[in-house]
Amino acid sequence: MRLMSKLLIGTAMAAALCMPAAAKDLNKIGISVGLLGNPFFVATIKGIEDRAKEINPNVEVISVSADYDLNKQVSQIDSFIAAGVDIIMLNAVDAKAIAPAVKKAEAAGVVVAAFDVSAPGANVTVMTNNVKAGEEACNYIAEKLGGKGDVVIINGPASSSILDRVQGCKEALGKHADIKILSDDQNGQGSREGGLAVMQGLLTRFDKIDAVFAINDPTAIGAELAAKQLNRSEFIITAVDGAPDIEKSLASGNSMIKASASQDPYVMAGQALKLGVDVLNGNKPAEPIVLLDPQLITADNVKDYKGWTAAR
């Protein structure tokens, strides 16, 4: 009789181990993004909120801006843990230094879903293929310059997305021996104001520039504003994002900004949340890192572009 009981207990335990984890309710989400003032992150938050409310109409969503400050973002993650969030949706401001904070969150039983930028240790990551985005934007430059000229790169914060874009740009330009990169280490902070300030300095420093690659659209807009202020119009500008302001610039036909490798922040962040919920429910994704292809937007095809503000 005892033997039979032991066998039954053993069988029950084995069956329990084979069963999938019980579904957990999605009650609270914490979102930390690089800069809330950037329309890109407005679209990501909407993508997360819309997908979350499909799962639980009463879900609580807490959105905060790290302002590209690592210490601030680490503090935000600590606050999310203390608040008992189920998932942290993370746009890391530093692709490497954020790792201990991610580890701490997961040790507390919180799922971390990274979007737009990789974060070491995150359960899932969804982002644009940023190497390809930088490559496409700078292939456009090389083509328009006929493989010859002087180019500046306006860099940004040390996130993986920006590092990858610059890498892709350099790889594209590096195929042309007669293209010279005059500067690639000036940080425009991913903002219009930063792009303006950096471009003012570059225009003062260099008498002739043939093209500018800006790591995102706000930076590109700031660069164009600086050029107008200093009466410089000899160069073209390309970027990455496909933001609403860039749509208008491309459609106008009279902007120095000629192309942007577009992203879909709404879809990107929503997909990251979906994968995060899968992890929350004990289902490990087959592909924990998902790369989305960019689309190069120019004056020639902008009319067919479904942008960030399009109806969903």
Region roles according to the model:
Residues 3-8, 17, 22-312:
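A residue-level marker of the well-folded mature domains of exported/periplasmic proteins
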